[in-house]
Swiss-Prot record:
Family, as annotated: Belongs to the chaperonin (HSP60) family.
Cellular localisation: Plastid, Chloroplast
Organism from which the protein derives: Chlamydomonas reinhardtii
Keywords: ATP-binding, Chaperone, Chloroplast, Nucleotide-binding, Plastid, Stress response
More about this protein: This protein shows ATPase activity.
GO cellular component: chloroplast
Physiological role: This protein binds RuBisCO small and large subunits and is implicated in the assembly of the enzyme oligomer.
UniProt cross-references to InterPro entries, sorted A to Z: Chaperonin_Cpn60_CS, Cpn60/GroEL, Cpn60/GroEL/TCP-1, GroEL-like_apical_dom_sf, GROEL-like_equatorial_sf, TCP-1-like_intermed_sf
Protein name per its UniProtKB record: RuBisCO large subunit-binding protein subunit beta-2
Molecular function in Gene Ontology: ATP binding; ATP-dependent protein folding chaperone
Length: 259
């Protein structure tokens, strides 16, 4: 019934239901609404409002947002946000096709990752990727370290600084480039906020313009979770890990002889 009420507000109509004392037998033209366009297919119906009820729609959206803020259940919150998107005209359907079930699942996961990244970007914005943002953050650690009086805390600050500079070196090394050289070149251009290394093209350029970006929320959460895991290791009395297996030496090639 909530969806029907949303449609009624969008079109300026009235929901026909017993609670309002209206039945189909008693319904008149007054309960009908108007729409600029209605598209009906086998699987979906799309209703486009004509703008007459914009004020009522905004009030309805505000009401649903308040409900979503008070709801703790993720499923219910997702459905409420879906209603907000539909009333606001922000609904998109992504259809994914594939030749095999395995390929379909893999594509579906990629689309979900892209959607989650987009949602995160909308929430907190974006920063340049390629490990360059973390490298720039590492330069802020020294000023924080100066405010610390505990030597152990200062040691922790040094560890975080080294860790923040590691991703860009790893990305460069995986691309077949000297990670230390790449890191130093980015640091030499620290005054250019979007300057960085594009591993895909092996070039130094404006990463924001090149589309090499990360959602700010993803970068922040990754750093927070990494620090949390490290803290757990430091506080644990014992850490159990698998014993690394030694690589077996290749058997010597059988030598040929004269017969």
């Amino acid at each position: 019934s909530s969806y029907l009420e949303d449609i009624a507000i969008l079109t300026g109509g009235t929901v026909v239901k017993d609670e309002l004392g209206i039945t189909l037998e008693k319904a008149t033209e007054e309960v009908l609404g108007l729409a600029a366009k209605v598209s009906i297919s086998k699987e979906a119906t799309t209703i486009v409002g004509d703008g007459r009820t914009q004020q009522q729609v905004e009030g309805r959206v505000k009401q649903i947002r308040n409900l979503a803020a008070e709801t703790e259940q993720e499923y219910e919150k997702e459905k409420l946000n879906e209603r907000i998107a539909r009333l606001s005209g922000g609904v998109a359907i992504i259809q994914v096709g594939a030749q095999t079930e395995t390929e379909l699942k893999e594509k579906k996961l990629r689309v979900e990752d892209a959607l989650n990244a987009t949602k995160a970007a909308v929430e907190e914005g974006i920063v340049i990727g390629g490990g360059c943002t973390l490298l720039r953050l590492s330069q802020k650690v020294d000023s924080i370290k100066e405010t610390l009086s505990n030597e152990e805390q200062k040691m922790g600050a040094d560890i975080i600084k080294r860790a923040l500079s590691y991703p860009i070196k790893l990305i460069a090394n995986n691309a077949g480039t000297n990670g230390s050289v790449v890191m130093q070149r980015v640091m030499d251009n620290i005054d250019q906020p979007y300057y960085g290394y594009n591993a895909a093209t092996d070039t130094f350029e404006d990463l924001m313009e090149a589309g090499i970006i990360d959602p700010t929320k993803v970068v922040r959460c990754s750093l927070e979770n990494a620090v949390s895991v490290a803290k757990t290791f430091l506080l644990a009395d014992v850490v159990v890990t698998e014993i690394p297996e030694k690589e077996k030496a290749p058997a010597p090639a059988a030598g040929g002889g004269d017969y």
